């Protein structure tokens, strides 16, 4: 029996990171977490390309472009969608999530999903480096591991 598991080493891996600027007080912290994760796991700043887009809705298209370029071992998507008083939150959160999943399946490039979908600003802050950890860091961990899993599979 052969068991394939991804190692948590970013050494030599190239990452594209897409970050939504909307709610930048949250997304910048997610970005810091993702970069910190890559560097702590042996990656280098030279192998990270960051693309900033207006908001979370623009992330899937940009992620697809990065993934299809063939330059990256993984793409990390970072954004924050915070519920307001209209149904806009539901539409954006659903479509962004579906779009990112579709990109990964179509391109066979691993995607680290770091889109916060929270009911309150406080919940977003908690997930961007305070009480609940940093979901940008977590998304980068997934990207590192999955890039290595797919390399192992061939």
From Swiss-Prot:
Pfam family, one: DMRL_synthase
EC number: 2.5.1.78
InterPro entries reported for this sequence: LS, LS/RS, LS/RS_sf
UniProt keyword annotation of Transferase present: yes
Residues annotated as binding (2S)-2-hydroxy-3-oxobutyl phosphate: 85-86, 127
Gene3D superfamilies: Lumazine/riboflavin synthase
Keywords carried by this UniProt record: Riboflavin biosynthesis, Transferase
Top-level taxon in the UniProt lineage: Bacteria
Function: Catalyzes the formation of 6,7-dimethyl-8-ribityllumazine by condensation of 5-amino-6-(D-ribitylamino)uracil with 3,4-dihydroxy-2-butanone 4-phosphate. This is the penultimate step in the biosynthesis of riboflavin.
Reactions catalysed, as given in the entry: (2S)-2-hydroxy-3-oxobutyl phosphate + 5-amino-6-(D-ribitylamino)uracil = 6,7-dimethyl-8-(1-D-ribityl)lumazine + phosphate + 2 H2O + H(+)
Assembly: Forms an icosahedral capsid composed of 60 subunits, arranged as a dodecamer of pentamers.
Name of the protein in its database record: 6,7-dimethyl-8-ribityllumazine synthase
GO CC term (a single one): riboflavin synthase complex
Pathway stated in the Swiss-Prot or TrEMBL entry: Cofactor biosynthesis; riboflavin biosynthesis; riboflavin from 2-hydroxy-3-oxobutyl phosphate and 5-amino-6-(D-ribitylamino)uracil: step 1/2
Gene responsible for this protein: ribH
Disulfide bonds: none
CDD domains linked to this entry: Lumazine_synthase-I
Biological process annotations from GO: riboflavin biosynthetic process
Recorded family membership: Belongs to the DMRL synthase family.
GO MF annotations, alphabetized: 6,7-dimethyl-8-ribityllumazine synthase activity
Binding site for 5-amino-6-(D-ribitylamino)uracil: 22, 56-58, 80-82, 113
Residue positions of the active site: 88
